[in-house]
């Protein structure tokens, strides 16, 4: 909204200084700084409020070191969501579907996560919101995004062919499978981020790194010259997604101020599901959904460790009568906890892995 106001003032009075409002880099930086300041200013008040009302119990199955931690207020994802929504509302073109689809995704899955946290912490419902209800929420969001892209003529490029990373002339046409693909990606990534949210600063830090990568690709995809040169799909209006992504980056960084070890608050499903859905929708909007598993490699590894653990346990129990495990505990970060690694060391090493995945995704721009 601030963008429209400043543009209106500039159109009337022609202030040279206000011309910067037309530059994506300026508005992306402004949105990022705004999101950071909002989290830093509101964070202490939200933490104080939630400490009196919303305390997350430590799971019984958690590693011994994890159970020693003091109980913390949850639903910290509300801070991320508020900072993101307000900064984007101020600096982005909110009438663009590339912007409001991400805003809706964050609000929608944030609401699903909030309900889960509320049931677990306030109503003391073991397990919180049933898994199939979460799945319904994810599927409904996927249907909204997929069907809107399918029927809106301005977004026709999204449902057409997409490029394949590492292959210069290889493309895939989803055809009638576009909407199911959208549903799968949103469900998979939102669950992956949710699984990763198990240590102080882990999900927020790795998410911030992934959003930096998405911001870069969004900026390139929104520029016809860069997109053509780099052989990636050109997305008309896709540059606005860079503003959205940078707001998410700094909302996560601001949250890390309070969530780094020892954490004062945790994001809960309110934050993890919102961040995961935003990551998926952004990748879909800039036609980088096939690159997302690499860019979000840490989340993929965490999910893979859980799937592999469950499948191997069931397989060995069926074959031998006794289930065996590959990892000491899944997701993967708990495996390293049980091996005696300090929590800070696990988190920082996972951040380093996230940076490596981010750099590898950048390499695909030329390795084609």
Swiss-Prot record:
Topological relation to the membrane, as annotated: Multi-pass membrane protein
Top-tier EC class: transferase
Signal keyword on record: no
Parts of the chain that traverse the membrane: 30-50, 72-92, 99-119, 135-155, 170-190, 201-221, 238-258, 265-286, 345-365
Keywords carried by this UniProt record: Cell cycle, Cell division, Cell inner membrane, Cell membrane, Cell shape, Cell wall biogenesis/degradation, Magnesium, Membrane, Metal-binding, Peptidoglycan synthesis, Transferase, Transmembrane, Transmembrane helix
Names of the cofactor(s): Mg(2+)
Keyword Transmembrane carried by entry: yes
Pathway: Cell wall biogenesis; peptidoglycan biosynthesis
Any single biological process term in GO: regulation of cell shape
Domain of life: Bacteria
Pfam family name, one: Glycos_transf_4
Reaction catalyzed: UDP-N-acetyl-alpha-D-muramoyl-L-alanyl-gamma-D-glutamyl-meso-2,6-diaminopimeloyl-D-alanyl-D-alanine + di-trans,octa-cis-undecaprenyl phosphate = di-trans,octa-cis-undecaprenyl diphospho-N-acetyl-alpha-D-muramoyl-L-alanyl-D-glutamyl-meso-2,6-diaminopimeloyl-D-alanyl-D-alanine + UMP
EC number: 2.7.8.13
GO molecular function: metal ion binding; phospho-N-acetylmuramoyl-pentapeptide-transferase activity; UDP-N-acetylmuramoyl-L-alanyl-D-glutamyl-meso-2,6-diaminopimelyl-D-alanyl-D-alanine:undecaprenyl-phosphate transferase activity
InterPro entries: Glycosyl_transferase_4, PNAcMuramoyl-5peptid_Trfase, PNAcMuramoyl-5peptid_Trfase_CS
Compartments, as annotated in UniProt: Cell inner membrane
Family listed: Belongs to the glycosyltransferase 4 family. MraY subfamily.
Its job: Catalyzes the initial step of the lipid cycle reactions in the biosynthesis of the cell wall peptidoglycan: transfers peptidoglycan precursor phospho-MurNAc-pentapeptide from UDP-MurNAc-pentapeptide onto the lipid carrier undecaprenyl phosphate, yielding undecaprenyl-pyrophosphoryl-MurNAc-pentapeptide, known as lipid I.
Protein name according to UniProt: Phospho-N-acetylmuramoyl-pentapeptide-transferase
Species name: Chlorobium chlorochromatii (strain CaD3)
Organism lineage string: Bacteria, Pseudomonadati, Chlorobiota, Chlorobiia, Chlorobiales
Recorded name of the encoding gene: mraY
């Amino acid at each position: 909204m601030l963008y429209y106001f400043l543009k209106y003032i500039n159109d009337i009075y022609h202030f040279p200084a206000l011309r910067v409002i037309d530059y994506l880099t300026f508005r992306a930086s402004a949105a990022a700084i705004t999101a950071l300041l909002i989290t830093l200013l509101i964070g202490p008040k939200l933490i104080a409020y939630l400490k009196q009302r919303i305390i997350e119990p430590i799971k019984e199955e958690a590693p011994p070191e994890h159970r020693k931690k003091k109980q913390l207020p949850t639903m910290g994802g509300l801070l991320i969501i508020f900072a993101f929504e307000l900064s984007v509302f101020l600096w982005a073109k909110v009438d663009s579907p590339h912007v409001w689809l991400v805003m809706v995704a964050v609000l929608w899955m944030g609401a699903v996560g909030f309900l889960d946290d509320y049931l677990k912490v306030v109503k003391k419902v073991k397990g919180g919101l049933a898994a199939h209800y979460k799945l319904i929420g994810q599927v409904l969001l996927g249907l909204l995004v997929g069907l809107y892209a399918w029927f809106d003529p301005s977004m026709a490029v999204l449902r057409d062919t997409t490029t394949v990373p590492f292959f210069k002339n290889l493309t895939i046409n989803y055809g009638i499978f576009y909407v199911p693909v959208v549903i799968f990606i949103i469900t998979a990534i939102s669950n992956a981020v949710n699984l990763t949210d198990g240590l102080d600063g882990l999900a927020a830090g790795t998410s911030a790194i992934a959003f930096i990568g998405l911001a870069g690709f969004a900026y390139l995809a929104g520029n016809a010259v860069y997109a053509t040169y780099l052989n990636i799909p050109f997305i008309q209006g896709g540059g606005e997604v860079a503003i959205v992504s940078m707001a998410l980056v700094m909302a996560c960084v601001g949250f890390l101020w309070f969530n780094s070890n020892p954490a004062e608050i945790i994001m809960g499903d309110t934050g993890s599901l919102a961040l995961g859905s935003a990551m998926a929708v952004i990748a879909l909007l800039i036609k980088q959904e096939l690159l997302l598993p690499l860019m979000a490699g840490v989340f993929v590894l965490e999910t893979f460790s859980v799937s592999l653990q469950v499948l191997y346990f069931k397989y060995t129990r069926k074959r031998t009568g006794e289930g065996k495990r590959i990892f000491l505990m899944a997701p993967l970060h708990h495996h390293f906890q049980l091996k005696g690694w300090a929590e800070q060391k696990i988190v920082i090493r996972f951040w380093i892995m996230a940076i490596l995945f981010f750099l590898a995704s950048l390499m695909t721009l030329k390795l084609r």
